[in-house]
Design a protein with these regions (language model features):
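Context-gated lysine
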Residues: 2-3, 10, 37, 69, ...
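Acidic, proline/glycine-rich low-complexity IDRs
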Residues: 94-125
Length: 125
């Protein structure tokens, strides 16, 4: 069994990876790996236990899915730093503005995903 994405799907996934590359490499909360068997795998990391997290592990099927996961992780990181809680769905207006400000450079490079940012505040799938 060898995973093959449609060329357009693979291109959109790799575009998201390229834009978020520094964040992907430096985050301690998840890992993004390639498997010849299933494709890109997103693995959440439990930093307390030092192991794979119980939830959040999946095969990446499209660029939008990966974008949503990365933006969610980034928003949680921002909330950990400046928020009153770590959950972006509970962000105050000021916290939302800070999240939007910090995610803006990524969105500038991925204009097709502009409409997806608000999902972080509603946890819409």
């Amino acid at each position: 069994m060898k995973k093959t994405y449609e060329p357009e799907t693979k291109s959109t996934i790799e575009q998201v990876i390229d834009v978020f590359n520094d964040y992907i490499r430096t985050s301690t909360h998840f890992e993004l790996l390639w498997s010849d068997k299933v494709g890109y795998i997103y693995i959440s990391i439990d930093n307390v236990q030092g192991s794979i997290g119980d939830t959040g592990c999946c095969v990446v099927n499209c660029g939008e899915e990966l974008f949503d996961k990365l933006v969610w992780e980034l928003a949680v990181d921002i909330m950990e730093e400046v928020g009153h809680t770590i959950d972006p769905t509970e962000a105050t207006l000021l916290e939302r503005r800070e999240i939007e400000r910090r995610i803006h450079p990524y969105l500038e490079q991925l204009p097709a995903y502009q409409d997806r940012l608000q999902r972080v505040f509603t946890r819409e799938k």
